[in-house]
Amino acid sequence: SDFSLFNLGIPYLYPGNTQEIIDYGLLAIAMSRFSGAWVGMKMVTDVCDGGGTMEADPDLPAIRFPGGYQKYTDPRLVPPITLALENEVNIRRLEAVRQFARLNGVNRQNNAAARVGILSTGKTYYDLMQALRDLNIRDGIRIGKIGMPFPLEAEFAKQFAEGLETILVVEEKRSFLEMQLREILYDQPAHPAILGKSHFPPIGELDPDKIAKVLSDVLGIKDRRSVPSPQSPAPKPQGARPAAFCSGCPHNRSTLLLEGQIAGGGIGCHTMAMRLNDPSRAISFLTQMGGEGAPWIGMTPFVDHPHIFQNIGDGTLFHSGYLAIEACVAAKVNITYKILYNGHVAMTGGQAAMGALPIPELTRKLQAEGVRKTVVLAENVEQYSDLSVFASNAELRSREELPRTLRELPSIPGVTVIIYDQECAAEKRRKRSRGQLAEPTMRLVINEEVCEGCGDCVRQANCMSLTPVATELGQKIRIHQSSCNKDYTCAMGDCPSFVSVQTKSGTGLKKNSLPKLPPADVPAPRQMVKAGDGYRILGPGIGGTGVVTINALLATAAWIDGLSVATLDQTGTAQKGGAVVSHLLLSEQPIEAPAKVNAANADLILGFDLLGVVHPGNLNTACAERTVAIINSDVVPTIDNIRNRAPVSGPGQMLELVNSVTNRGRNIFLDANRLAEGLFGTHMAVNLFMMGVAYQAGLIPISLDAVEQAIEWNGVDIERNLQTFSWGRKYYEDAAFVESVAVPNRDRKEAVPFDRVSELREYQNEAYAQEYADFLEKITEPSLKETVAKYLYKLMAYKDEYEVARLLTKPSFERGVRDMWASAESVSYNLHPPMLRRFGVTKKLKLGAWFRTPLLVLKNMKMLRGTPFDLFGYAAHRRMERSLIQWYRDLIEQVQTNLTPENLPQALEIAALPDQIRGYEKIKEVNVAKVKQQAVEKLAALKAAQAGLLVVGS
């Protein structure tokens, strides 16, 4: 930006905080009107994404205008008049700008008598001030703040340099101020030494810590800062929290391709499909906004691939994407545009796209532009009652027809279009919470005993609400109900475990009837910290859960109390479930520091997300003598955990890491997700609940009245939010009481002892269970016996039609479903019976509550299993499942024969191989083939190792 504006001859101002955005903005407007020049403003992320208290006096800034300058312009852009215009733009106007800046004090200095001066600008100036504060440097240095980096005002620069021996220029990126300063001072007598890029890198951004290090070197002083040095290694099982498509996001499904197909990426939420490393979303290139599909025009003559898909969001389409489509039509290339029509510009706040057309009108426009065929894939086909409004070459289909459409359109020469019509999931959720959209009454529940943990539902839905859980029966998938967005795509997984629950309209998850906490029930905090000249709060959390809202509530409350406030919300793609970090600076004095918490400067870490807390950049803000941590100890799965079906590691190592760099004795760790969902029925209450805990601990220097007023001003679910805050305060005072009130989290069922022998008795009969027990008696090594007990059971209790019927009608499951919902009216079963597949039934059938009776009948027919009357048992798949039982017994007997203390770990690996035999039908068959191959290789290695030991021993 600096050099672009410089080359264009455009003066610009550089605000470093919220106050300066207003002040400099007004100055820039006045400067432009006075001089006739375009005047720019340099805005950086840390300023734009921040906020704070400011002086809103309409008479400030007091703007003065120099005299003696007359603007000149001439519309005749031909020589020799252009010479006069060049003089106007590059000389007269810039000189007028300098005079204006000088008269209005746009650049300022502290006029200290000193040998060393430091010059800086914008956001970096406030980083400099924080660095000086961290180094405890209060005076003896002349500080200059440049409000207008270009053109650098020469008179100010000369006055600033007077009497100095050294000037350190603190600026980001390439030398710019330093370059201008050298040019101004070069011919001055006894000019000072100028340092800058000799000490600061020309890339990346500067922060107070980098600046403090350079100041220590230049000034020859000791760095007195206390920077944390963790005593424990950083936990390796978890990485950073990447952004992901929201639960129920249409892009989870719309970006899918068939095998061998490729797509181009573009600008929008759908770009995140690139980081999934998923062959079924094979994105080959990424373009600028509005260039979607254009690279294919140039690539087509040089590649053998005959066709490509191109993803494009509706916001981009209506902004500039039409041009690329028109170019592809003109170039006669074979391309299918996937217009991802979700009705909102979701990546940047959910606003409506400017110039948006209704889908029927859009199909007509595309036809007029030369598009050969358009297929509209709609979530709700019934909304289009009059098909005549669509273009004649357009066809309306259900979104379930995506695979068919992906097969058909590449065969049509030229440009074709898929319009995937499904509203943004985040906006749906927001509308539902505000009562602007009806809440669906159908919910899905996974029967975890039927679930095989194969992850096919995850492959279908790519949904953040499908969380992996470790159970006694192995890894399973569970729907996190309070974050589920009711998209239902997961039920397309090839698995009979999904049960549809029809709830009464206006009801949902069963909520605890909480007694209201009167103010007298929670005393005022016994001791409260003071804001003083700077109290800093760091809030790492998960995007979309209200972290930014908490920061805004606290900032508002502090303003009500008369404190100075500065905030920064580092969000990035946080709205999509990625990491978000909020920074809050409270002070009893005017703030001249960045809102961003730097190394060893956090007073409170309000850790809404443990993964975010242990990120090195966030841990670096802690100081063992200063920082108190209030941490949500629950580890929420990342999209990588979910896609890879990897259970989340426990919090132990990460919490110990937090303790090692903070005030261990004052820290509070709590499973806030379990408590919030137990108390309020939703994970969205977590952050406000934790804010209440921190407040009652005396760690938020704001009055109770101000906090409650800020919650009221927010205007959303006021009474419940006040109660959430109060219950968090109550938890600090009496954790045991709050724990006793919170209902057990419905998504975290307590483990109960699992009796495999009894289950096999229910599965078949006493003899079958005894057969299992007898085989286990043959195994003497305890750990091997424990492993075989798990996986022999898994293979013996294979889930045929009789067993699925038994598990779906199991009283404990049916009771759990009823207890989960405030008003469950009926249950339906989503089944794709193998027998019907042979007759061409290609998708699941939704069978209503009436089907429970046939399931009970089928369950009681288990005595037919394995007999000549078992019609299901004749299927090749069932024969394979039965054969696995004897295969595994033979495998274990061979392992036992070759077992030694030395090869026990390898033996346990072999015994646990059936854990990988997951899924139903084709999915299971593929896994069986892989496991059998592994068994052959591992058993051969075990025998070879045993043979080697015998040779050595002899």
Feature roles, as predicted:
Residues 98-110, 114, 708-954:
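Active-site loops and adjacent core secondary-structure elements that bind or stabilize anionic groups
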Residues 15-245, 250-251, 259, 267, ...:
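Flexible, low-complexity linker and terminal segments
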Residues 103-187, 278-296, 319-321, 351-359, ...:
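Glycine-rich, anion-gripping cofactor-binding loops and their flanking helix/strand elements
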Residues 1-26, 31-35, 42-47, 59, ...:
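Active-site cavity-forming subdomains of large catalytic enzyme subunits
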Residues 1-34, 44, 262, 267-347, ...:
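Thiamine diphosphate
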Residues 1-5, 99-100, 124-128, 153-154, ...:
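Structured alpha-helical segments in the cores of large, soluble enzyme domains
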Residues 360, 365, 500-539, 545-777, ...:
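Active-site cofactor/cluster-binding pocket
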